[in-house]
Amino acid sequence: MGGGSDGPPVKFNRSQDHHELYLNLIKWELDDEMQNVREKLQNWNKKRLIENGITLFDLIGKNDGWLFGQRIVKFTNKKKNDMGFHRFRQGDIVLISKKDPLKETPLEGTIYSTSRTSIKIVFSDTPKDIRKHTWRLDKGANRIAFDRMRDALNSIFDEEGGVPLRDLLLGMIHDPPSTASLMPELGGVRGRTTTYAHDLNRPQLIAAKAATERRLTLIQGPPGTGKTHTAVRILESWSKMDIGTILAVADSNVAVDNLLEGLLARGVRVVRLGQPVKVREKLRMATMDAKMENHPLRRDLETQLELNEKLNRRISSMKGKEKGLAYRDIKKGWKEIRRIENQIRDDILDKTQVVCCTCIGSGNEILDGRRFPQVLIDEATQATEPASLVALTRGARQVVLVGDHKQLPPTVISFRAEEKGLKRSLFERLVDLGIEPLLLSTQYRMHPAISKFPNQHFYSDRLDDGVKSENRLAPAGLLWPDWDNPVAFVPVDGGEVVSPDGTSRENPAEVSWVIKILNDILEAGEITKTDIGIITPYAGQVRAIRNSMSEKLDDVEVKTVDGYQGREKEVIIFSCVRSNNEQNIGFLSEMRRLNVALTRAKRGLIAVSYTHLTLPTILRV
């Protein structure tokens, strides 16, 4: 295996080496995630679970409608009007139990929505006796992801596993960069000509052309350079080539929805796989579930379901032979239901040009037996290598990876898996292999003064500003040191403290200043609540800021740095938290995290930080 002695290999001499390495890494990740959940449930008392926001107690539930045949249950707190602090977010897999999920069989559901006063959860099967008990809510672990990544690794290991670009992806060839640049072989057709959208700038157009002419293309998109815009135009160009159904994936549901929205706007026939609850509401009409509900064969399906339900209701009063025949008919009925469902899905997939889903979602069994010669992965630098391979093992002959290895890497829970290489994305390994990414070099988000520092320190001054200062005027409500340079540092003398749950950090003095700055900007009337974002490296500070905000500020987003990648706001308030004599800036020493934090703002960036930390010199650009 090739690569540095201290890090994971960049290339592999045998597919077996790759298989063994990554199979161990994903096993460690699953084991450590489940052990982490188990230890907290076993060892933490009720008070600590509540303070850490990972468990809610004393919930009462009631049915609250349906989402494409799945039951929605609304949970509220029996003892108080609001839900209190918690870390549950839309799309999270959760466990519902009466007392203890480790001592009973919990119900598994998915968070549909959260508010100050309630949490709505979607269940595949309607829970029984939901109104008769009080419930507790815990976060669950995602074993499906492990199973699908394991299957993908097995396919890569197997020469007949349906991965035409296997040797290139693993570096098992003499000259990977040259091989990556070769014309793809797409079903016997060596590259059909296509047209490109007129709204691409020069770097975007170069990337789009490469994506249709090369076997493997890496596209690096720094903040605000139009990664998703370019990805959508590539997918549109591919769809006009009419070579076969295209697979478009990303690591997160948010990024998949952005691709979906762009494709729908361009008139591309697209279907979105995945649970509708995880899809943006206005896009749910493009989900497989919604399309199945509107399919002409839906009536046949409902008729068969009604017949089965009638038999189920009557069977308890039957005896002997009659009962045996009824069971036989029910079994035949379910077989017919599955046949109709498969027929509907196949018809939808046969007529679609692009299938959109998450990397892990592309392992869904409804795609089994299908091949996708062209695969695009957005957010490729936030996906672990095994997650990316789930999509690439669907028969990819032409691949585009879009991302930015100067921003946040994949999220990995297991320290040992991270140390051995799981935190390195496939995109980054291919860069290390010598395949140079095409740079989208014009940024359209930030005021030039805001983009100056990240351009110098992360992108070697290779970025151009596509917006002028006069188009990003500093907002009122703050006495900017220089109105032509909307980057401000607010020095705070106040110490950091360990959060009440003992797992994070917070800084009360910074919290007070953040709230004051927030109110001052809003009172000026030029910026709305949804135009401001508050970023901090620590979950404890997120909680402290939220707890200090009045109800009228609910619409202001407060997130960790990790929760803000891919997002932008008119104004960003950045609370740094750390305050110590050792000049220890903690999470901020990770330059990729700092890059994300400093590149979310369009018109104004305000850093609130301890006076003597090194961060002020960084921000005074």
Question: Each predicted region: which residue ranges?
Answer:
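Pre-ATPase regulatory/linker segments immediately N-terminal to the P-loop/RecA-like helicase/translocase core
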Residues: 2-25, 31, 69, 80-206, ...
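Short, basic/aromatic beta-hairpin or loop at an interaction surface
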Residues: 61-74
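Beta-strand cores of modular interaction/reader domains in eukaryotic scaffold and signaling proteins
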Residues: 74, 87-89, 93-97, 110-112, ...
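Conserved helicase motor core of SF1/SF2 NTP-dependent helicases
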Residues: 241-244, 252, 360-613, 620
